[in-house]
Amino acid sequence: MIIPFKASSVKLTSGYGSRILGGKTDFHGGYDLVGVGSTDVTAAVGGKVAVSRMVTDKSNLTWQWGNYVCILGDDGRYYYYCHLASRAVNKGDTVKAGDKLGVMGSTGYSFGAHLHFEVREKNGRTTVNPETILGIPNKVGTYTLPAKSQLERDLDVLVARGVIKTPEYWQQTAPKVQYLSKLIHNMAEALQ
């Protein structure tokens, strides 16, 4: 599961697909999410900032998003983070998963502070159910990340200290080589 906040839990307040809004049936192209314990919005994937702006002109089709960031993901898809109170990135910036993009807000067409998270295919038009990206079920509710293992916590320390760049290689290798897991733990303890 990926939570696009600096939080371990998130509330899904409106899912992907048909919904009733203002008495009318409408198609909702993303998820409306509220971070539990944090309003800092983070990148779900790595990529390049394609758009970082505030839209107030109602003749612009994106005015409903208000203050928003769009990431062109390394996978070629577009990832939208909308209704932000503020933005922490600029067009052209390179981001990695987990980098702060801004702060959750209520700009544009919004009835309260939340993040509208939307994914579009490479053509920029076809929306993707965020469940396939985030692993958060398309059902209103609160979702929490599973607790990290000791190995994952140790790898986080090594990444934060710049000892390793990415934990993926180590996570795949360590279970195969028992002593490697112990080595990683000892390195992390020494750096704390």
Residue ranges and their predicted role:
Residues M1-G17, K24, G76:
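Polar/charged, compositionally biased leader and regulatory segments
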Residues I2-S8, T39-G46:
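Short coil-to-beta-strand transition motifs
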